[in-house]
């Protein structure tokens, strides 16, 4: 990591530490260096994974539509900070490098020593079709030069004329579905994936920022189109909605999700990840929501899901109804960490979705 990039990320951490008692700041995209080429962007909806380097920028998920301007501004700042400029050259004269070839002069040296422009966003990989994962697709993937977003004028350099938006084919199928009684999908065409894969795994055809990028389809997990993205050299996994440190996993049964699929996805992540020592360090995992994780965190979350599954499955075998299962509180010892009685995904909703998923097996 360059000094400029370190200072950019450290400024966020320092500001948060110095204002520990201050009110929570919203509508801000924070940057967390993970390891290797990988950075975690927090505050734009779902967590965004960014690979930034010599080949440009690759994003895993794009956040909400409302935060697109802040995401782009943050990505451009990060890409600029990571563009290592040559050391300034002040030498002029016969003994300076390049003089025999006729290109040593104050003007030429200034050009050589100037920083390179930031590289463009070249890929966006969607781990699911949720709006907080795909909301920025349209404006981040195709953005005309000199456009203005939230009062910031972006130069022609650093903005891709067209980035590839990649996802599993089921994401495109569901985003392009036309609701009954309607003439077109409510999701604009510009937000749809431009490239899809349909196999159990997929990899970019060449190294990106000096490493291989591998994508795994996880069927019937949060939905039927979930992807896990693995950066092989940086040793970082982007887990999407399969892993959340702020809630129980969201099971969207209407879109092909299931509790067992979530559990299978967590086991898949643990199969890929290698800890450094005692399940700590080593492979780092970026969840769909919440803090950065290591193997131990994923294993604890997996164990929690397995225990709750077994409890609900046992209650189903005893003939208990969904209301009886809710009353029995099979999640009680984990509610302090992941439970909620309000918001878009409550504990009761998780229990009901798990019950229906296990009954359908």
What do the PLM-derived regions correspond to, one by one?
Residues 31-99, 106, 227-241:
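Conserved beta-strand hairpin/beta-sheet module of binuclear metal-dependent hydrolase folds
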Residues 212-276, 293:
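Active-site-proximal loop/helix segments of hydrolase catalytic cores
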Residues 236, 260-320, 324:
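Divalent-metal (often Zn2+) His-rich catalytic cores of metallo-beta-lactamase-fold enzymes
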Residues 13-15, 20:
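Boundary at the C-terminal end of the N-terminal hydrophobic targeting segment
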Residues 33, 155-219, 223-224, 233, ...:
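Metallo-beta-lactamase
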Residues 1-11:
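Bacterial N-terminal signal peptides
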Residues 55, 66-163:
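Active-site metal-binding motif and surrounding structural segment of the metallo-beta-lactamase
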Residues 317-361:
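C-terminal regulatory/interaction regions
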């Amino acid at each position: 990591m360059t000094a400029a990039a370190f200072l950019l990320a450290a400024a966020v951490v320092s500001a948060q530490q110095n204002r520990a008692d201050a009110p929570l700041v919203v509508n801000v995209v924070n940057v967390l260096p993970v390891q290797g080429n990988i950075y975690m962007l927090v505050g734009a909806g779902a967590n965004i994974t960014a690979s930034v380097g010599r080949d440009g920028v690759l994003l895993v998920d794009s956040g909400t539509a409302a935060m697109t301007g802040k995401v782009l501004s943050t990505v451009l700042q990060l890409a600029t900070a990571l563009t290592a400029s040559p050391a300034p050259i002040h030498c002029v004269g016969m003994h300076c490098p390049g003089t025999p070839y006729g290109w040593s002069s104050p003007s030429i040296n200034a050009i050589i020593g100037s920083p390179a422009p930031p590289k463009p966003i070249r890929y966006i990989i969607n781990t699911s079709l949720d709006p907080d994962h795909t909301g920025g697709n349209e404006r981040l993937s195709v953005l005309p030069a000199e456009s203005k977003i939230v009062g910031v004028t972006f130069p022609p350099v650093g903005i891709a004329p067209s980035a590839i938006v990649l996802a599993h084919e089921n994401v495109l199928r569901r985003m392009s579905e036309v609701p009954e009684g309607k003439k077109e999908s409510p999701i604009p065409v510009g937000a749809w994936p431009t490239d899809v894969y349909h196999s159990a795994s997929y990899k970019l055809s060449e190294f990106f920022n000096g490493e291989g990028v591998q994508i795994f389809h996880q069927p019937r997990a949060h939905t039927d189109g979930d992807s896990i993205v693995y950066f092989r050299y940086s040793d970082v996994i982007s887990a999407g909605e399969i892993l959340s440190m702020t809630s129980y996993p969201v099971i969207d049964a209407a879109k092909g999700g299931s509790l067992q699929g979530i559990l299978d996805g967590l086991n898949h992540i643990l199969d890929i990840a290698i800890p450094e020592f005692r399940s700590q360090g080593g492979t780092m995992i970026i969840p769909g929501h919440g803090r950065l994780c290591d193997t131990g965190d994923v294993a604890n979350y997996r164990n929690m899901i397995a225990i709750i599954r077994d409890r609900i499955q046992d209650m189903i075998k005893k003939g208990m109804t969904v209301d009886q299962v809710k009353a029995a509180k099979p999640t009680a010892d984990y509610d302090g960490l992941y439970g909620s009685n309000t918001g878009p995904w409550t504990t009761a909703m998780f229990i009901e979705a798990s019950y229906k998923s296990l009954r359908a097996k």
